[in-house]
């Protein structure tokens, strides 16, 4: 059973929602289109941020550790770490609601732990992302959730 579940509208509309649930140290992300032509868009799974595992050199009393805790509070704890960079992202917001690709976050510098973390924001919206987003908003693709059209995934 999930530890917690959150659903929120995706960017700039009320038809396509992002669903995030936490289970066993991971976040699972899916998109759901509501209203007519209800659809489910399976998403991704990502490990929940664990500072001890993901940043073992981070000193708990450092400025950066306090910055991470502040960011955790503002993001309601929905944090994940990028695989090949010292970045922590806010999982709640992404351009495609069924993907784990945060729009913003913070970047740590373990060599300068008494300096504040850096803020980053991604503005990547290539043609593929825009087309996929529009298709999802229009109810194309995905798995039907309407009883008369539902088929097992």
For every predicted segment, state its role.
Residues 14-153:
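Extracytosolic and intramembrane catalytic regions of membrane-associated proteins
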Residues 1-3:
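Alpha-helical transmembrane signal-anchor/signal-peptide segments
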């Amino acid at each position: 059973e999930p530890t917690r579940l959150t659903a929120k509208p995706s960017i700039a509309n009320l038809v396509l929602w992002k669903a995030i649930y936490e289970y066993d140290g991971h976040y699972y992300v899916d998109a759901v289109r509501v209203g007519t032509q209800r659809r489910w868009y399976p998403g991704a799974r990502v490990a929940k941020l664990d500072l001890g595992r993901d940043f073992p050199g981070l000193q708990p009393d450092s400025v950066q550790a306090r910055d991470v805790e502040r960011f955790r509070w503002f993001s309601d704890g929905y944090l994940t770490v990028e695989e090949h960079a010292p970045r922590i992202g806010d999982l709640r917001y992404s351009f495609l609601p069924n993907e784990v690709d945060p729009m913003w976050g913070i970047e740590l510098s373990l060599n300068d732990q008494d300096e504040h973390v850096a803020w980053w924001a991604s503005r990547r919206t290539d043609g593929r992302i825009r087309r996929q987003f529009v298709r999802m908003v229009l109810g194309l693709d995905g798995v039907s959730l309407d009883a008369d059209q539902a088929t097992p995934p």
